[in-house]
């Protein structure tokens, strides 16, 4: 007899220009509301939401959140990855509903139940943090005003889905890991949307361009909710990105989606996938297609490639038990990243 499955996915998703003004239609009277936002530029959106809700709202920057402080009935994350992730952590700890209001679209965290690798490590005492947003409000006019580099990084994150699914299939065949055809299909559909629209949306000058990106990223979040893990959207390409992120002094030195795109090129080569096509798509979008363009030292990339498999020992990927330094260097040379 198969086990009972439980999916946690967003109940309400609204997106489009001016969607922020629809917030009261999505969030009914909820008691005390904690609004977690960025340090500066996104605070004005938090203030507007508080004004619209006409409720007892407390606005706080993501780096000032007191995670153990109770007393809120709803948590809203407004901003990029960090405010949304901290809202998920608070929601998970206190078992309160969480609403995501992204102001950028640089990765699939806008709809995912899960937080970044660094926060997973930092807050490991709380267990496997998972909090699917009950609602997502994506105002495309606001997201369109985000730096184009971050929006392009969102496409970079989507490119990685082909590797994540291939790694998942490999783990299913070789290790007997549970596999969801439905979740994998959703993730691959998001990848296909990115590839199929790359030329058209690459400059992100139209609301429609952002709409395509947001839809694809939300699809990834739903895929993870169905799978009950980040498996359909995070494989060896993400392990490579994480291995670099944990080694840089400041998080702002690198952009997650750009690293994922580079990792996708490398892992496509290892999988025997057409890495040249992926690299061409990345180039069309304007993503870095070499270590130099991404301002990544060769030794750092080699160290990341040879240790990435150790970051999540429970997650089998094409990296297996790890690459030797010689194999890692050959891969970087063959895909012309160096």
From Swiss-Prot:
Keywords: Cytoplasm, Lipid biosynthesis, Lipid metabolism, Metal-binding, NAD, NADP, Oxidoreductase, Phospholipid biosynthesis, Phospholipid metabolism, Zinc. Its cofactor is Zn(2+). It is found in: Cytoplasm. InterPro entries: G1P_dehydrogenase_arc (IPR023002), G1PDH (IPR032837), Glycerol_DH (IPR016205). Substrate binds at residues 108, 157, 242. The keyword ATP-binding does not apply. Its EC number is 1.1.1.261. It comes from the Archaea. NAD(+) binds at residues 81-85, 103-106, 112. It holds the Pfam family Fe-ADH_2. Zn(2+) binds at residues 157, 238, 256. The keyword Oxidoreductase applies. Belongs to the glycerol-1-phosphate dehydrogenase family. Homodimer. This is Glycerol-1-phosphate dehydrogenase [NAD(P)+]. The gene is egsA.
């Amino acid at each position: 007899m198969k086990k009972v499955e439980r999916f946690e996915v967003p109940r309400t998703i609204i997106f489009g220009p001016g969607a922020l003004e629809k917030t009261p239609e999505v969030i009914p009277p909820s008691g005390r509301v904690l609004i977690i936002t960025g340090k500066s530029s996104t605070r004005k959106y938090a203030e507007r939401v508080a004004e619209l809700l006409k409720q007892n709202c407390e606005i706080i920057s993501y780096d000032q959140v007191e995670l153990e402080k109770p007393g809120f009935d709803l948590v809203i994350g407004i901003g990029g990855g960090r405010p949304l992730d901290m809202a998920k952590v608070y929601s998970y700890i206190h078992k309160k509903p969480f609403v995501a209001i992204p102001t950028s679209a640089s990765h699939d965290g806008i709809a995912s139940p899960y937080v970044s690798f660094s926060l997973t490590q930092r807050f490991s005492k709380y267990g496997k943090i998972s909090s699917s947003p009950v609602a997502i409000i994506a105002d495309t006019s606001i997201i369109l005003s985000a730096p184009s580099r971050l929006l392009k990084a969102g496409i970079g994150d989507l490119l990685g889905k082909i590797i994540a699914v291939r790694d998942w299939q490999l783990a299913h065949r070789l290790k007997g890991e549970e596999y969801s055809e439905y979740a994998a299909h959703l993730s691959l559909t998001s990848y296909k949307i990115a590839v199929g629209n790359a030329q058209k949306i690459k400059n992100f000058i139209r609301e429609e361009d952002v709409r395509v990106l947001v839809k694809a990223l939300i699809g990834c979040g739903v895929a993870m909710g169905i799978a009950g893990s980040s498996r359909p959207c995070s494989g060896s390409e993400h392990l490579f990105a994480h291995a670099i992120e944990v080694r840089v002094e400041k998080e702002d030195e690198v952009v997650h989606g750009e690293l994922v795109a580079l990792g996708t090129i490398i892992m496509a080569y290892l999988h025997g996938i057409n890495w040249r096509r992926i690299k061409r798509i990345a180039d069309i979008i304007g993503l870095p297609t070499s270590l130099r363009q991404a301002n990544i030292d060769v030794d750092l990339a080699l160290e990341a490639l040879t240790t990435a498999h150790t970051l999540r020992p429970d997650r089998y990927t094409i990296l297996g038990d790890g690459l030797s330094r010689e194999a890692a260097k050959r891969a970087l040379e063959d895909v012309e990243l160096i």
